[in-house]
Amino acid sequence: PFSSGKVFLGLSGSDSNDTQYKLFTYANNKLGKEKKKKMIARKKGYHGVTVTSASMTGLPNQHKLFDLPQENFIHTETPHYFKEGKEGETEEDYVRRLSETLEETILDEGPESIAAMIAEPLMGAGGVILPPKGYFPAIQDVLDKFDIPLIVDEVVTAFGRTGNAFGSETYEIKPTSMTIAKALSSGYIPISAVIVNDELFEPIKEASGDIGAVSYTHLRAHETG
């Protein structure tokens, strides 16, 4: 989905989506954008089982009894045209309505407070929901308007599942960052990765010395790969 970038390895899609939240919080703090702490996800989206990734998830059964989602996680509408489209509403009109709803949500929350949006190219655990035609270009127009990056969760869709190498190609997505996992090892060993484009990496690369060595990324699965 982007020509060059940097990779941070992990063990699972859940922990890599945790890393996504940490990464964007870290980047915004280093760039003097400390107010950018909120993340937009979608109802019925699935991003993992840890506290942070489950907060991104838009499935109520993943929230009840766990006091989730945490603060700073917002959920916008599910792009399910066949179920949620109104009578007489075309697919194009439906996409327009969802993009307008997203813009209203951003304005209500305050664009200056939104760190990123995360989305699966097609929703897996939420019901295998394919986005309507033109959905991602439309919502990216809204995100670009407010300088909000898009994280694409390709744990389910990467490596050919949608007919292209990545679901981002199939659905015309231009992500700033991407999560991959299961298919990275064909499911044989636990491994995942966060891939960020150079536009995100370059401004913060010198700040990485504040963290020091990250032994968490020195795993046997990575050596095996």
Residue locations for each model-derived region?
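Conserved N-terminal phosphate-binding loop of PLP-dependent enzymes in the Aspartate aminotransferase
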Residues: 1-220
